[in-house]
């Protein structure tokens, strides 16, 4: 659940009754969207709003008391509002969270001194003061909006996603299990740049994980539990039982590392050492983790899993790591995404466990069981790629939306036909800017909230494709 502090702005010589009714309208909308609110009781200030130095202090103290709960702050203006009281509240609270500034519509039939809001004008003053105070803020899509309207509803959902992303990345701890595959320079990244953004990388040698896994007994309680979890997660018909048991042991070892290091996501060296020296692929385990909202990326793609984690935080749904992989006939706006795969099963129409056809020819089919294969179900999706630009010392990203079409292909692995408007322009951007071929995706529409979080609040270099 997202938690917002709420500031209702009031200016003394404007009609306070608008704040009383406006406050309740806004709170009702937030409750409808299952957003928890932190706000003083209505009788604690005039109209339950903020208009004076004393009011600002009261609200700042309330917000400080709940600072570990509050994900963001909504500033709403049922009338002109007192810009100083609003800015002082935020400064003294010291929350350092996203802020959304909203203003009510005036109605042409109620423009007398008794009912005129002037929120249209007051919003400019509030934003001017926030800028003077050095407080970063977001805006609604329309300059003024009715709380009960579809625009405000969409803006609240977008802002909640922004808040969740900013919160999620603060102190995020990500596990890198194994070195990157030697042939994949494309997944290089700067650990130091991520650290400056509050994202810590915990490394673990692949041999340490395999050491734990190989010491486990088939009858170990944790292994039995994981084995049952795998068999309940996907169809394993035709897969050797020995391979599934090996997966279970590997899963126990990985989860031990996650728990000990308090991780929120992992990236794993998935080829070819695991197959050569242990005898399975980790795809099913990674699929299960991602489906359970513990994102896991293949090929030790750390910035790839950062993108997955961002998408998951924004949407509350599983995210996957995919290759932008193929054209789709001659349609310039369609293509095919693919991985071997470790996609979360919620992405698929139907899925099953299989073997990794690409590397089976090198290491033997018997050593490559454990992929999750199928066709991605039709529906909208948001994609995101995060990358560290080491030459310029910054973190950059691109984000956009598209649609999985559900069209089927005679192919292997986990795949999906997709459509993105102006796809060729996006591909030109990816190649010109030297981005990786991996992209994260989630089956939700959350690009706007992610763009706001990364560019406005984290100050990353972000391209929004539309």
Predicted regions and their residues:
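Periplasmic-binding protein-like
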Residues: 69-79, 100-102, 263-269
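Long, internal scaffold/assembly segments composed of regular secondary structure
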Residues: 224-314
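Cap/lid and interdomain-hinge subdomains that line or gate substrate/regulatory clefts
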Residues: 1-4, 36-38, 107-225, 230-234, ...
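Extended hydrophobic packing segments that form well-structured cores
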Residues: 24, 363-466
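Short, acidic/small-residue loops that bind anionic groups at enzyme active sites
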Residues: 88-116, 124-129, 287-300
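Glycine-rich, highly charged phosphate/nucleotide-binding loops
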Residues: 48-68, 82, 246-253
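C-terminal catalytic subdomain
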Residues: 293-407
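N-terminal basic/disordered segments at the start of proteins
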Residues: 1-33
């Amino acid at each position: 659940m997202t938690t917002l502090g709420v500031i209702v702005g009031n200016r003394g010589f404007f009609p306070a009754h608008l704040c009383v009714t406006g406050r309740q309208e806004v709170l009702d909308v937030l409750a409808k969207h299952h957003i928890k609110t932190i706000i003083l009781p209505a009788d604690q200030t005039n109209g339950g709003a903020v208009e004076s130095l004393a009011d600002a202090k009261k609200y700042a103290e309330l917000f400080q008391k709940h600072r570990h709960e509050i994900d963001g702050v909504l500033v709403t203006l049922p009338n002109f509002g007192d810009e100083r009281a609003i800015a002082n509240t935020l400064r003294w609270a010291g929350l350092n969270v996203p802020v959304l500034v909203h203003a009510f519509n005036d109605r042409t039939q109620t423009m007398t001194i008794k009912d005129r809001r002037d929120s249209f004008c007051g919003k400019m003053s509030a934003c001017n003061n926030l800028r003077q105070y050095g407080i970063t803020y977001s805006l609604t899509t329309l300059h003024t909006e009715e709380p009960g309207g579809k625009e405000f509803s969409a803006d609240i959902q977008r802002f909640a996603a922004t808040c969740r992303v900013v919160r999620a990345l603060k102190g995020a701890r990500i596990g890198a299990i194994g070195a990157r595959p030697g042939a994949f320079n494309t997944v290089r990244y700067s650990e130091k740049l991520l650290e400056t953004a509050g994202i810590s990388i915990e490394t673990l040698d692949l041999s340490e994980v395999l050491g734990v896994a190989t010491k486990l007994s088939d009858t170990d309680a944790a292994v039995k539990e994981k084995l049952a979890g795998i068999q309940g997660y996907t169809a394993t018909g035709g897969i050797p039982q020995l391979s599934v048991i090996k997966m279970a042991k590997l899963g126990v070892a990985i989860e031990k590392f996650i728990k000990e290091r308090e991780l929120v996501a992992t990236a794993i060296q998935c080829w070819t050492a695991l197959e050569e020296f242990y005898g399975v692929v980790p795809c099913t385990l990674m699929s299960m983790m991602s489906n359970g909202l513990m994102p896991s990326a293949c090929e030790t793609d750390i910035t790839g899993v950062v993108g997955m984690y961002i998408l998951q935080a924004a949407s509350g749904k599983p995210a996957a790591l995919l290759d932008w992989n193929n054209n789709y006939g001659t349609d310039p706006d369609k293509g095919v995404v693919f991985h071997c795969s470790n996609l979360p099963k919620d992405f698929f129409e139907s899925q099953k466990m299989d073997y990794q056809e690409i590397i089976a020819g090198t290491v033997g089919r018997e050593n490559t069981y454990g992929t999750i294969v199928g066709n991605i179900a039709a529906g909208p999706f948001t994609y995101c790629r995060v990358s560290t630009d080491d030459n310029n010392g910054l973190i950059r990203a691109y984000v956009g939306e598209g649609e999985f079409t559900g069209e089927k292909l005679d192919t292997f692995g986990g795949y999906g036909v997709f459509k993105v408007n102006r796809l060729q322009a996006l591909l030109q951007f990816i190649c010109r800017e030297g981005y990786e071929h991996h992209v994260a995706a989630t089956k939700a529409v959350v690009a706007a909230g992610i763009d706001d979080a990364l560019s406005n609040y984290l100050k990353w270099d972000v391209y929004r494709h539309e």
